Amino acid sequence: ASFVNFRNMLFNLSMIIMLLIMIFIMEGSLLGLSILFLLSNTFINIFSTLFLYKRNLHFIPSIKLISFKLFKSNLKLGLSFFLINISAIIMFSTDTLLISHLLGPEHVIYYALTLKVFIAFTMVQGFYIGPLWSAYSAKYLEKDFDWIQKTIKKSLLITLFLYLCILITISVFNHILNIWIGNSDYYNFDLIVAIAIYVSVRLWSSNFSTLLNGLSLTHLQLKTSIAATLLNIPLSIYLVKYTSLGIAGIAYGSAISLSIFAVIAPFYTYKILKRESYK
């Protein structure tokens, strides 16, 4: 996890340097920006690969080490993660399209500004929950279920603290807008509450999805992510068109769709840990 963070830092640093070169030396264009992004990504990936394999020779791929016995199980697991990620991309990218189509493009700015404030909490959560994926995997192989249970409890406590921060953010949101964009013209209390609930559901779910990913248990996530994707669009359209929620209906539609996993996951996780601890 530390190496991945180091790699991401190098990528961001290289992008800043290349953007400065583009601003002061080259004529700015979308094509130029795309080329810089491609070059930066390519160079950093080459450097990261050489750096990693030079320090860890046993990580170098070899045909001799391929185990075709594991091919089917690895392909099944990889396909599950792929479908989960595709579902997430569809789920998280359709909201603005729905707003533009149902309410008009001028309403997108309300949603985008509000979401950018609250989505910061998922970034904060990512700092401590990201490394837990590999840690859960290691502890699962060691059969250290006490550590896993204690860690998930700590993660949930941190999530509760983030909920408190979200409540504070709701109460001062108009001041945040004034500081950020210079006015509070895009203040919409109903939308603020809806997005706060939507982000809260995501924070709660991330605790359990990270654990289940670490245990390579993707069955529940695959089913619920597909169900959420299929439910989200028609539900959001219904809430916008046939209720008085307006733009907030988009966020509520996403929150309700994600709640399928958020409700089932704690019980499923408890069942798995209880079963494994008695083996």
Residue ranges and their predicted role:
Residues M26, L30-F37, S48-F92, K143-D146, ...:
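Interhelical loop/hinge segments that connect adjacent transmembrane helices in multipass membrane
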Residues L57, F118-E142, L211-G214:
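Helix-loop junctions and terminal segments of transmembrane helices
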